[in-house]
C-alpha cells in the first residue's frame, strides 16, 4: 500500500483469523479502509472516492517534480473457493502459503503442493485529476495485463464474489440496520434474491394507502385546486392528494426503519415499539453482529473486517459473538483493545502493528520466553494483554517496584498534569 493517509508504505499479511493490535493512531483503521477501497462493493459509489486527506501527509502533487502522486493499494485474496476459482478463472495466480509469496514462472507441478493454492491479485489506483480539479480512482485486476499496458476493471459484482464486509466503529447502528445500498439488511436481501419484487410490492401498497383523508385536509387540498384553476388549465393540477413519500425506491431505502419492542406496554395492553436507533447501544451492536452471522450462513465465503466489536457488550457476549463469526466466515479480521477478545486468539493470530515515519509493519505475536501456553492463557488479562497493546514496556524487578512506580506516576499526574501525562 502506497500513500494512504498516515501510512506511506506497508506490506501486511493476515492469517485466516486475526486481531490487529496496536497503539492508538497506529494505522489499524487506515489499513482496513484501504482494503475496503479495493474489495468493498459499494465503496467506489461514494463521491468523491478519495479526498485530500487520504494521501500521505495530504500530498497529492509532488511540489518539486510537479507530478501527481498516486495512491496504490494491492490486495492478494488467497484460499479461493471452487466457485470463486470458476468465476475468476482468467485472473488466477498461485500463492505459496509457506513462503508467503506468489509463484512466478514455476513448473506446473508446484501448484499441486499442499501449501500452494489459487489466489487473485487486485489493486486500487487513485489520483488527482488536474484537468477536472477533482479526485478519481478505480479498481483493477493485476493480471492479465492487456497488450496496450492497461488492466481489466474489477467491478462491483466481482467484488461481491469476494464477500468482503467492513464494519467501522461509527457505522455500527447508524445505517447497518437500514435498507440503504450496501447496508447489512440490503446485503441479506441481495443474497436471498428477494429484492426484485420486494420494492415494487411495497410501492403498490403505499400507492393504495390512504393518507391525509380527514375533512380538514380534504378541504385544504380542494381549496388549493380551486386556486390553481384560476391561473392554469384544470388538467395541470388535477386531484391533489397526499402520499407517505414521493414513492421512489431511493426514498424508501432512506426512510424505512426497523422498529423493535421496548418492553413497555401501552394503555391498551399492546407492546410499545420504537425505532432501532432508540435501543441501547449494546442491543444495537448485538443486532448488527447477528446480521453478520446471517450473512455468513447465506454466503459461501465471507471476509469480515470489524473495528472494536466489544463496544457496549458484556464480556461473555463478546466471546460468544467473536467465536461464532470466526467459525462461520472464511476470514475474520478484528481490531480490538479488549482483553476478552484478544484472549480468544492464539499469539500467532494477533498481528501487532507499528507505524514509524509513515512505514507500517505488522509482526505476529509470540509466546514470551519460558512462558508455557497454559500460563499464558491463565495470566493473559493481568500480565500479557497490556504488553500487546502498549507502545513501550518497562521491566521491573518485582511487585513492590511495580506498585511504587504506578503510584508515583499517578501522583505526578495530579501534581503536574502538564508535565506528566
Where do the PLM segments sit?
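Glycine-rich phosphate-binding loops of NTPases
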Residues: 45-70, 80-204, 266-274
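Membrane-embedded alpha-helical bundles of multi-pass transporters/translocases
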Residues: 13-66, 70-74
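Extended helical coiled-coil dimerization/tether regions that scaffold
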Residues: 176-179, 188-287, 291-303
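Short helix-loop-beta junction
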Residues: 408-421
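Short glycine-/polar-rich loops that comprise or flank the Walker A/P-loop
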Residues: 69-73, 118-122, 160-164, 300-301, ...
Amino acid at each position: 500500500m502506497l500513500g494512504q493517509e498516515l501510512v506511506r508504505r506497508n506490506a501486511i499479511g493476515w492469517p485466516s483469523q486475526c486481531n490487529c493490535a496496536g497503539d492508538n493512531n497506529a494505522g489499524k483503521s487506515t489499513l482496513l479502509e484501504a482494503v475496503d477501497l479495493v474489495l468493498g462493493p459499494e465503496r467506489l459509489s461514494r463521491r468523491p472516492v478519495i479526498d485530500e486527506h487520504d494521501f500521505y501527509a495530504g500530498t497529492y502533487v509532488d511540489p518539486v517534480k510537479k507530478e501527481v502522486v498516486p495512491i496504490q493499494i494491492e490486495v492478494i485474496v488467497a484460499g479461493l473457493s471452487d466457485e470463486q476459482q470458476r468465476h475468476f478463472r482468467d485472473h488466477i495466480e498461485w500463492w505459496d502459503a509457506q513462503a508467503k509469496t506468489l509463484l512466478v514462472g514455476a513448473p506446473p507441478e508446484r501448484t499441486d503442493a499442499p501449501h500452494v493454492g489459487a489466489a487473485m491479485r487486485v489493486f486500487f489506483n487513485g489520483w488527482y485529476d488536474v484537468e477536472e480539479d477533482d479526485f478519481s480512482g478505480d479498481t483493477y485486476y493485476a493480471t492479465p495485463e492487456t497488450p496496450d499496458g492497461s488492466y481489466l476493471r474489477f467491478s462491483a459484482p466481482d467484488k461481491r464474489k469476494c464477500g468482503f464486509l467492513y464494519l467501522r466503529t461509527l457505522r455500527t447502528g447508524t445505517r447497518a440496520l437500514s435498507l440503504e445500498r450496501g447496508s447489512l439488511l440490503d446485503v441479506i436481501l441481495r443474497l436471498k434474491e428477494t429484492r426484485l419484487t420486494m420494492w415494487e410490492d411495497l410501492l403498490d401498497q403505499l400507492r393504495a394507502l390512504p393518507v391525509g383523508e380527514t375533512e380538514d385536509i380534504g378541504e385544504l387540498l380542494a381549496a388549493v385546486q380551486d386556486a390553481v384553476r384560476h391561473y392554469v388549465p384544470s388538467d395541470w393540477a388535477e386531484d391533489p392528494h397526499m402520499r407517505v413519500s414521493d414513492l421512489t425506491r431511493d426514498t424508501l431505502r432512506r426512510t424505512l426503519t426497523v422498529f423493535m419492542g421496548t418492553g413497555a406496554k401501552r394503555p391498551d395492553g399492546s407492546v410499545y415499539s420504537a425505532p432501532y436507533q432508540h435501543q441501547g447501544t449494546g442491543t444495537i451492536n448485538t443486532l448488527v453482529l447477528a446480521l453478520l452471522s446471517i450473512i455468513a450462513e447465506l454466503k459461501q465465503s465471507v471476509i469480515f473486517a470489524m473495528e472494536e466489536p466489544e463496544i457496549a457488550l458484556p464480556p461473555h457476549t463478546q466471546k460468544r459473538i467473536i467465536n461464532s463469526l470466526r467459525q462461520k466466515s472464511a476470514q475474520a479480521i478484528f481490531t480490538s483493545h479488549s482483553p476478552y477478545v484478544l484472549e480468544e486468539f492464539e499469539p500467532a493470530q494477533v498481528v501487532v502493528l507499528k507505524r514509524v515515519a509513515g512505514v507500517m509493519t505488522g509482526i505476529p505475536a509470540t509466546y514470551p520466553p519460558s512462558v508455557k501456553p497454559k500460563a499464558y492463557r491463565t495470566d493473559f488479562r493481568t500480565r500479557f494483554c497490556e504488553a500487546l497493546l502498549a507502545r513501550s514496556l518497562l521491566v521491573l524487578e518485582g511487585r513492590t517496584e511495580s506498585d511504587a512506580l504506578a503510584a508515583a506516576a499517578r501522583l505526578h499526574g495530579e501534581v503536574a498534569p502538564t508535565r506528566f501525562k
